[in-house]
A protein has these predicted regions:
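Rhodanese-like catalytic fold shared by cysteine-dependent sulfurtransferases
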Residues: 1-18, 25-58, 64-103
């Protein structure tokens, strides 16, 4: 399964999964899910920034609703990342379910 639900995120974090926000810096600064990284999917340096990450670690990617992050997940898998999952519904669903954000 390549997606996880909002309710599952904390369990994955406890197992040392890292969180990558693929939204713009402005979106990130307006509130995020305590992300470990913020790499704008639309940035021309997105793939270059991904190459700086360890392909052996586990990552959960998210965006506003899941579109950008699903594309980012596909790219990461193409680049050889072993474990990548997409947060279903992105930060929009996260907020709708009442989970906290960091500003």
């Amino acid at each position: 399964m390549d997606t996880i639900k909002s309710e599952e995120l904390e369990c994955f974090r406890k197992d040392k999964w890292l969180v990558l926000d693929t939204r713009t810096k402005e979106e990130y600064n307006s509130g995020n899910i305590n992300a470990d990284y913020n790499f704008d999917y639309y940035s021309p340096t997105f793939a270059e920034k991904l190459s700086e990450l360890s392909k052996e670690k586990n990552y959960i990617v998210y965006c506003k609703s899941g579109g950008r992050s699903s594309k980012a997940m596909s790219l990461m898998k193409e680049l050889g990342f072993k474990n990548v999952k997409n947060l279903e519904g992105g930060i929009t669903t996260w907020i709708e379910k009442g989970f906290p954000i960091t500003k």
